[in-house]
């Protein structure tokens, strides 16, 4: 993971940086992370995201998650869902695992049936929607700098929220 405490400190203290982080969780089960050959643990990821949230309460923290990786058990999936529900993440991108020719994962045993992968992806997307709604609600009433888009009726804040701007207010 290429986000160090020094980077968190820099973003927290320098106003030229947008308070938006995108960190590749991939999974919350250490067994699955090991199978994916990820060089970090869920404990490291949790500590990093909690550090960001404590330093920058309004920061956006997004992540990518893969469901259905070969060998992902029901317990592994429950670990992922449970972590996400209580995580400080503001949004997630969910990817159902699919074989890619020539990759180590494509030759692994323990393939998860497609219907199960699709159901797990739906469940995690639902959790992701709840995370986004919680983050948006936490931003209600706050003021942020934003970059207007197109005709000025839409904008993106530094913490990655898309907002509508009333006519004449841009």
Residue ranges of model-derived segments:
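Generic beta-strand/beta-sheet core signal
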Residues: 24-26, 62-64, 95-97, 149, ...
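Structural beta-strand/beta-sheet cores of well-ordered domains, especially the beta-sheet scaffolds
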Residues: 19-21, 59, 90-93, 142-144, ...
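Terminal RNA-binding accessory module
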Residues: 107-170
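AMP-binding (ANL) adenylation modules
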Residues: 96-101, 136-137
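Conserved non-cysteine loop/helix-boundary elements of the Radical SAM core domain that shape
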Residues: 1-91, 102-116
């Amino acid at each position: 993971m290429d986000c160090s405490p020094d980077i968190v400190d820099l973003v927290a203290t320098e106003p030229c940086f947008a308070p938006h982080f995108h960190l590749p969780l991939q999974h919350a089960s250490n067994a699955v992370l090991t199978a994916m050959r990820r060089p970090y643990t869920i404990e490291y990821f949790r500590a990093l995201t909690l550090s960001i949230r404590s330093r920058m309460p309004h920061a956006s923290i997004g992540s990518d998650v893969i469901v259905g990786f070969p060998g992902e058990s029901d317990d592994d999936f429950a670990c992922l869902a449970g972590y996400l529900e209580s995580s400080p993440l503001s949004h997630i991108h969910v990817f159902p695992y699919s074989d890619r020719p020539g990759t180590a994962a494509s030759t692994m045993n323990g393939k998860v049936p497609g219907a199960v992968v699709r159901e797990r992806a739906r469940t995690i997307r639902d959790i992701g929607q709840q995370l986004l709604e919680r983050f948006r609600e936490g931003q209600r009433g706050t003021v942020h700098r934003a970059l207007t888009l197109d005709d000025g009726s839409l904008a993106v804040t530094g913490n990655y929220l898309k907002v509508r701007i009333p006519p004449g207010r841009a």
